[in-house]
Every structure is written in structure tokens, then in C-alpha cells.
Amino acid sequence: MSRSLSECIDQGRGLVPADLVLKHGRVFDLVTGELVQTDVAICGDRIVGTFGTYTGRREIDCRGRILVPGFIDTHLHVESSLVTPFEFDRCVTPRGITTAICDPHEIANVCGLEGIRYFLEASAHLVMDLRVQLSSCVPSTHMETAGAALEAKDLAPLMDHPRVIGLAEFMNFPGVLMKDPGCMAKLEAFRGRHIDGHAPLLRGKDLNGYIAAGIRTEHEATTAEEALEKLRKGMRVLIREGSVSKDLHALVSILTERHAPYLCLCTDDRNPLDIAEHGHIDHMIRTAIRLGAPPLAVYRAASLSAADAFGLKDRGLIAPGRRADIAVLDSLEGCHAALVLAGGVVADDAAFSARSDIEPVARASVKVAEIAPEAFRCPGNRADTPVIGILPGKIITEHLTAEIEPVDGDKRPDPVRDLARIAVIERHGKTGGRATGFVRGFGMARGAIASTVCHDHHNLAVVGIDYADMALAANRLRALEGGFAVAAGGEILAELALPVGGLMSLRPFEEVRDALVTLREAARSLGVTLEEPFLQLAFLALPVIPHLKITDRGMVDVDRFEILP
């Protein structure tokens, strides 16, 4: 929808009617903080006129509304929405999210470069502007078995793709600090380009060394103190509010007009049920303002500061020459979009229907033999046992210990003490490996839940009390090509098929949302007390988030960066 420079100039001067004019609204100027009543003239995908009166070939009355720049999600994994990029686009763009910067490392851990290319191809067909960062840590560490491995030489051919924004979150921060050769090769290859960070709880001189590697942005701060240290050291801090990782309340105190130029908003991992019930970046905006953050600071972080942090200089303001990404709101506090333009296109059913689709990738990716109940035994001859302790609303876990006496060579689950069995089974057809352990925090009294969404290697993860139900749930996912399942009493109570890499559904997001409601209810019937049990389970297998995790190779002490004996 681009227009010639001559057309943009003439329409901006008002010599000819603009392609589209938003009439009689008030623009929230993120430079001055003013609310100014003005028309907004649009030529193709560009804003060409503000602070004046215009006529247009098409005019939309925005009387009583407030116009703000479209929102930018600065870090997310689309796969965590459990739908394809096309359904994600349809789900969030009408809420005002006109740009999203994704790291497709979930699908890349299943099928490698094929997964990244799928996202790059899909991005060309969407209403929103989906930008891709090249996945830096596939797999995230050496302590897991993924479906693929990507080195610097593998990423090099995609570095100059027009939709690529640098290198995605560098999760292997110990590898950076220890100058691991593979890590160093990627950092050197992307030197001078944008490199996104991931350094939970990293402080002091170790943080200095990590930033000195050229890493510019980071989303893992969970306290204001941690975020302020990263700001002081020159990082742009991305405030996160996902379905499990909920850091906005802890960080809202730093979301001030002084700090806003160096702050952004992101969701990281958010499923369609939470998006439908609460929202996306729009939910973060409403929540931050309700908690006392100044609206100017919040809207800057949601657009202008985000654009600046990632080098997207053509957006973030409602001003001539900028991309026509605009959300028309009921109020700044309510942040409910009545109309959204993405690159000058109205984000409505007609726009979504006009998109051309592409074939999905990574079908039939669950390559594991039938699983017997005995596979979930936890052998051992010592009572002293490591236990993963869940912290609700966090992906950081506690490294607990419990006395669990073996019975016939097996340490058994104990629902009275909230000690459930957790198992991770390699499902990429490589080693057939598996590991078992214990987790506290689910509140599970019976049955089992299983998932192939298992960060970041995406092996098959199961939590349960009854071994037969664990096997039933796990084997059901083999038949579904991956997904979620809840089992109890020898029956499958609920399920959701995710056949695209074992990560994404081919169904509309409304159907996925409804299935998640049923899954949550089924999990609660087992006694589960967690608000989002499936994403919480997924993060229990990510060995770059402190303190204790589990992969197909064993229990991982993240602080020592080693597998427990």
C-alpha cells in the first residue's frame, strides 16, 4: 500500500484528498504529552498530515476518541499463544498491537531453520508487522535434547533478511561469561547489530561482562532493584507480563516519565485464553495506569520507546512520515480499541480474510515409543531428594529437598505433602532418554497432566500422582501429534491437539481458548491450584531459569549449571 513520495507530499500539504482521514479525534502526542484535537491524514501506509483539517477519499469519524501510536510487543514467542502466526495476528492486532518482535525458538528447537523460515514467510502475509529475531540458543544449553541445533553459520544466511531484527534472547548467560566458543561465534557474527538479552538475577560485574558482549535489551528483571541496575548499566528493560511470568506489579514503580525512554513492554508467553479474558499489551497499559503509572510514561513504553530500542525509527508517533500504526481508543485509562490501523490498513475481518495462508511445518513431530506406567518410577536408595518448588506467577523455582523413602526401589508421589512426580521424555526421535523427579506446588491429588510444550527443547513433560494416568496422558499426545492432556481414573478428561511442532493448533483461536477453559477445569478437578498449570509445567524444564529444573537428561541445578547426580 505504499505511495510515491510525490503523492505523500501533496496529500500532506492538503493539495489533494488523502487516501484516508481520521476526523475529529484527539491525538495523544508522546513528545509533549498533550491531547490535541486534529485530523490525521494517511497516504498509503504512512501518516502525512496532523495538526490540521483534511479531506479524504475515505473518512472515519473519531469524535470522542483518543488516537495513540500502535503498540509494540518487544519480546514474545508466538508459539506460546498456541496458534499459528495467522491466528495470533487476528487475535491481538484488533487490540492495538501493530508490531510484534518474536523469537521463534520454540519451533526452531523442534525443526531448526525450517521453523524460523516459516515465521519469516508468514510475516509477509499478516496485517500486523511481525519482526523476527534469530534464535540464539537452540538448544538453550547442553543439558537437554532438542530437535535441532543452530550455530552461527546456520543463522548467517538470514541475518540480512528485511524482517530480521538481530539476535534473539541470549539465554545461555553462563556460556557468554565463560566465553563458550559457540556463544562467542554468534556474538561476533552479530556484533554491532541488535542482540537481545536474558539474564535473570545476574548482577554486579557478571552483568557488566554480559552487557559488554553487546547485549542491549533484557526482559527477565523481576524486582525494581534488578531492573534499575540494568537501566543504570545502559540496558533497555522490557517489562514483562505473560501468562506465568507476571512482573508488571513488581516493576511498575520504575515506570515513570523519567525512565520511560528506556523501558518497553512485552508479553513473552501469553496464551489465547488470557488474551481473550484480559488482553495483551493493552492489558499491561490498563494495569500499569490503574497501579499509578503516568499515562504518558506507559504509552511511551508501549510504542515510542519500544520503536527506538529496536531501531524501528519509522513508527512510535502519530506524526508525518511515520508508519500509519494507530489505535483509536475509548480513553487512555480504559485502552479499549474501537479501531486499529496497521500500516494504514484497518484491522477488521475483511483485512484478515484477504490474507494468503501458507502451509504449516513440523507435522508428526512426536517421535516416541509407547510409554508404559513403569517409565515413571523414580529409583533411588537415599531418602534425601531434590524437589522443584513452584513459585506462583514466576518461572524462577526453588531448589527444595524432601525426605522420601524408597518403596520397592521407587520413590513414590505423595499428594498429602504436595509431592507430585514430574517426568520429561525425549520426543524428537534422537535418544529416547527420560528423567523423573519431584515437584511441589501443583496441589495435585490424583491423575496426571501432560504437555509437549516444554521449554525450550519441547520434549514430552508429565506431572502426576498415578503412573497409569501419566502413561495414558503421555500416549494420548503421541496420537494427537502433541498438545495438552489431562487424565484421571483411566480416562482422558480433556485434551488439545497442537500438531504444528507439538506447539501450535491449526484451529481458530476462539476454539483454542475454549479448549483451554476445559483443560483448566479438568486440571482443577485433580486438585491443581495453579492458575496456568500447563505453561507453569512448560517452564519447569527450562535449565536457564534458576534454581532447579528438569530435562530429559535429569534434574538440573541451574545455579551450578550442572545435572544432579
From Swiss-Prot:
One of its GO terms (biological process) is adenine catabolic process. Its cofactor is Mn(2+). It catalyses: adenine + H2O + H(+) = hypoxanthine + NH4(+). Its EC number is 3.5.4.2. It is an enzyme of class 3 (hydrolase). It holds the Pfam family Amidohydro_1. The keyword Manganese applies. GO terms for molecular function: adenine deaminase activity. Keywords: Hydrolase, Manganese. It comes from the Bacteria. Belongs to the metallo-dependent hydrolases superfamily. Adenine deaminase family. HAMAP family: Adenine_deamin. This is Adenine deaminase. It comes from Cereibacter sphaeroides (strain ATCC 17023 / DSM 158 / JCM 6121 / CCUG 31486 / LMG 2827 / NBRC 12203 / NCIMB 8253 / ATH 2.4.1.) (Rhodobacter sphaeroides). The gene is ade.
